[in-house]
Amino acid sequence: MLRCWSVTVERSCEGMLLRRRILSLSASSFRNFTSGNNGDAIPFSTFTKPSSSIAPGDFLVREWKDWFKHRDVKQSHQLIDRIFDILRAPSNDGDDRAFYLHLSNLRLRLTEKFVLDVLSHTRYDILCCLKFFDWAARQPGFHHTRATFHAIFKILRGAKLVTLMIDFLDRSVGFESCRHSLRLCDALVVGYAVAGRTDIALQHFGNMRFRGLDLDSFGYHVLLNALVEEKCFDSFDVIFDQISVRGFVCAVTHSILVKKFCKQGKLDEAEDYLRALLPNDPAGCGSGLGILVDALCSKRKFQEATKLLDEIKLVGTVNMDRAYNIWIRALIKAGFLNNPADFLQKISPLEGCELEVFRYNSMVFQLLKENNLDGVYDILTEMMVRGVSPNKKTMNAALCFFCKAGFVDEALELYRSRSEIGFAPTAMSYNYLIHTLCANESVEQAYDVLKGAIDRGHFLGGKTFSTLTNALCWKGKPDMARELVIAAAERDLLPKRIAGCKIISALCDVGKVEDALMINELFNKSGVDTSFKMFTSLIYGSITLMRGDIAAKLIIRMQEKGYTPTRSLYRNVIQCVCEMESGEKNFFTTLLKFQLSLWEHKVQAYNLFIEGAGFAGKPKLARLVYDMMDRDGITPTVASNILMLQSYLKNEKIADALHFFHDLREQGKTKKRLYQVMIVGLCKANKLDDAMHFLEEMKGEGLQPSIECYEVNIQKLCNEEKYDEAVGLVNEFRKSGRRITAFIGNVLLHNAMKSKGVYEAWTRMRNIEDKIPEMKSLGELIGLFSGRIDMEVELKRLDEVIEKCYPLDMYTYNMLLRMIVMNQAEDAYEMVERIARRGYVPNERTDMILERANRILEERNSRSNLGRNGWNSRQRQLE
């Protein structure tokens, strides 16, 4: 408890001056704060380098461990900690018999006060609270009271579980075992009042009064307070009159009245009411003073709050503990903590303003949010010097401090000493430590920490879980990440949202697709959303295993989740299904039916399956799907015809392709694109004569062949050394008004390097140069590459000449580089630098050519050295 104020006026004046100094010195910081602070969470990713004023980490951890070890721990607190550990222990498939047995073995002597202490200690873990409350109700010799029910109701409301509480009250079954110690009607009034349903609470109160029953002082005050909280001020006056008539007016009544004035915004009336209590009821004044101070500070009226504290302190009969704690909390929250050491120095002389450990802790956590590590160090050191007994929050704050300060080893040492010093890390501390260890690349230690947290029943959230599992995957330890997921799933502690979790893709990348599928099943059972990337990794992993059935199920589930697969992904799945040795048609049909039911434009679905079957080397299956379109009353589109034709051509079913094309021609459906597909496909199938036939037929139909048609035909003609026809096609292509493409130019120069026939065919087409002057340069280049003519331009600048004939690409530069290496190997690296300057990226072929240049230069150097050594030897012999 805080020390009482001194009665002397001199000390009082000193206190007023000190408090005003705090406010005046912090005014500027307060102004800055009003535009800054924006949250309560301490960011994990923010690490701040501590200043040189902070002692070395190894020294700090030793000193603080001794301080924590010798703290004053009451036996009852140790017992409550033991109860809390039992309550948090995970149960086996919902069977709570083991935890009931463990609690019974403690042979607890249950009293109202002890139950309230346990509920207070576990109030932030709702499940633990409810389990203990239920267990206590079943113990012989103990019955829940108004106070214990009030406590559990407040805890449920604080956790925003009002619906659960109201459902409990509506059924009224939870009170059956408490009837002889707690009347049902009393409990219902108190319960609904705490739940905020004052209308129902008043109905039950009316029924009580009608039957001649009445509330006691406790019940009246709970109801009165609820009416204030819900701003039911008309009903408030009625209940207050009932309290007055029965003589129940006490300090609690006064504090509720002050709260009412504050809720109504009547702060002046609240102050007048408090001052009226000073002469005859200082206890009532003290209980309401904190409420008024809190209201003033919440409206930024710090000067008024300070003045009120000063003046009431002068009376000397009012307990100021609660009011001062609220005042200090408001100062901390408002940002008056820029200089913690100065703040503590000015607070400490104020009698009645002795800080308790929980207030120190609130200052420490506020500074941690602001990354003020010097301030945290000052306060923790001040606590240790003053002999303030730390509690678990203090130790958790120390661990967070070590993490933020970058003292990773020290944080780990403090964590490992938890049994020695009685340290129970909170979920926040676990989060801090795991993030710090991951940032330090100590993923195995982070794994041990998270495994320990899961074993102790802590739920750490998706961010921490994803951070560690991803870190393990990046470190090449996906098996450890898998074990982590399994451990969390077994204890029902798997986060529902795991943003960016890479475990599935990591397992698939190392070939452990079965493990990845198993992890995905755990995710599904635990309600974890499977992301688009997870689905994609699993599908490609299944394709690698040639499990088209699994890939098909996954892509169906993927779309049911609202994701849209890419065309290539779907095509690969269809291809995998088609390539399965058995049962291909079943899965193929199932997948097709699903897609037809999902897509509004059914032609797209049919086309996708025709394409997939063609890629899988199943043209008959592709034709089966194509024919299904007619049976379903859907007219195949040009795209459908193209995909079917490509399916035949890719699988070298030339006769079927020709027959299919003939049928389309009979139906008048041979469009320009179909001709192009036919010509290109025949060339790739090495059916050059047929391709040339369709090229001529296409031109006869008045259709202009595409650039690709010319390119593939020219390439095939050159491959078969039909250079006259190839040059003729080049001439025809150029006459159509199109510029020579890089592909055509490279094919001509490449073949010119292999054979002189290209140049000879070119010379037989002299009319080319007469009608198209820029073709003269191309002819000279062909002659140069054939070795038939010489040019005055340096080889390393030949790209400028080529650029006048057709656009350059990396293939062109590699040909040039190869010529340079053959003739002037020492210029090779200069040419590579020129390539890079012009914005082209060398590839593997470039590297191979450079390696050849190195070998040529090394051979030259070796021969030169041998010749020099031989000359020197002969000279010595002559001498």
From Swiss-Prot:
It comes from the Eukaryota. Residues 1-44 form a transit peptide. Its main location: mitochondrion. GO terms for molecular function: mRNA binding. Belongs to the PPR family. P subfamily. NCBIfam families: PPR (TIGR00756). This is Pentatricopeptide repeat-containing protein At1g71210, mitochondrial. It comes from Arabidopsis thaliana (Mouse-ear cress). The lineage of its organism: Eukaryota, Viridiplantae, Streptophyta, Embryophyta, Tracheophyta.
